């Protein structure tokens, strides 16, 4: 048995034990009886490109597990970057720039139980537009998504996927969001539109991600992670 086989068999055994112990198969609905939902952001300028292939595969597997999903495309129009004006601190829940997709996406945070962000790789980085959306939406309406499970997906032709994957995960870890993993980094390979559908291992990784996301939502009943709970925030500035 090689290392990968050992890891997979161990993970399957542990997962089976956890499922049996918690009875999560019966928990597709949260305590209010609402079917849980994953918001997925397609951060590609191409609505039906390879990022869509990845998110569609996740959506299909979520449905198998009884979890709803919605894919929101950021579009291919200009998206403003954050200018650190502080307007969202004076008017929480809304970015002062209301002429692009950002506020419409952040409005969907409240009704979502989890978040998945997918992006193509440009020069070893995620698409700049999706980074602008996430930064502004998290600043202005982060309270609505804080503590909810999250995952990132990077799609590339050849290289830069791991760096992009790490960049996309950064905001989640600052918002008390449990980051959901898979059997490998959440990466899919493809150049021409639709070519990622040939990446059989990558597609399996997407399905495993969907299974893990479903398991976590069912195990927690869709309840966000507590973070620091009622403890006041304690900041520290090393510049005196």
What is the meaning of each model-derived region?
Residues 65-70, 177:
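A generic structural motif
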Residues 57-67:
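A short, Lys/Arg-enriched amphipathic alpha-helix followed by its capping loop at the start of a domain
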Residues 22-54:
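C-terminal segment of N-terminal export signals and the immediately downstream linker at the start
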Residues 75-93, 195:
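N-terminal beta-loop-helix "entrance" segment that forms/cooperates
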Residues 1-14:
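N-terminal secretory signal peptides and thylakoid transit peptides that target proteins
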Residues 178-240:
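Glycine-rich phosphate/pyrophosphate-binding loop and the adjoining helix
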Residues 36, 90-184:
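Helix-loop-strand module that forms the ligand-binding subsite of alpha/beta enzymes
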């Amino acid at each position: 048995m090689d290392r990968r086989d050992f890891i997979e068999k161990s993970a399957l055994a542990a997962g089976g034990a956890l499922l049996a112990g918690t009875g999560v198969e019966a928990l597709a609905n949260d305590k209010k009886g609402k079917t849980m939902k994953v918001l997925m952001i397609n951060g590609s300028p191409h609505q039906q490109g390879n990022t869509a292939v990845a998110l569609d595969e996740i959506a299909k597997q979520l449905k198998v597990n009884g979890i709803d999903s919605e894919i929101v495309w950021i579009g291919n129009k200009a998206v403003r970057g954050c200018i650190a004006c502080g307007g969202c601190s004076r008017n929480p829940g809304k970015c002062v720039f209301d002429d692009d997709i950002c506020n419409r996406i952040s409005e969907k945070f409240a009704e979502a139980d989890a978040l998945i962000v997918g992006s193509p790789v440009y020069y070893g980085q995620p698409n700049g537009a999706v980074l602008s959306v996430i930064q502004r939406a998290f600043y202005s309406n982060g309270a609505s998504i804080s503590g909810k499970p999250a995952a990132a997906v990077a799609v590339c032709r050849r290289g830069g996927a791991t760096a992009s994957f790490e960049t996309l995960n950064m905001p989640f870890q600052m918002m008390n969001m449990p980051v959901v993993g898979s059997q490998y980094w959440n990466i899919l390979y493809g150049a021409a539109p639709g070519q990622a559908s040939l990446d059989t291992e990558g597609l399996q990784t997407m399905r495993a991600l969907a299974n893990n996301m479903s398991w976590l939502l069912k195990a927690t009943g869709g309840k966000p992670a507590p973070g620091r709970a009622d403890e006041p925030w304690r900041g520290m500035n090393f510049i005196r």
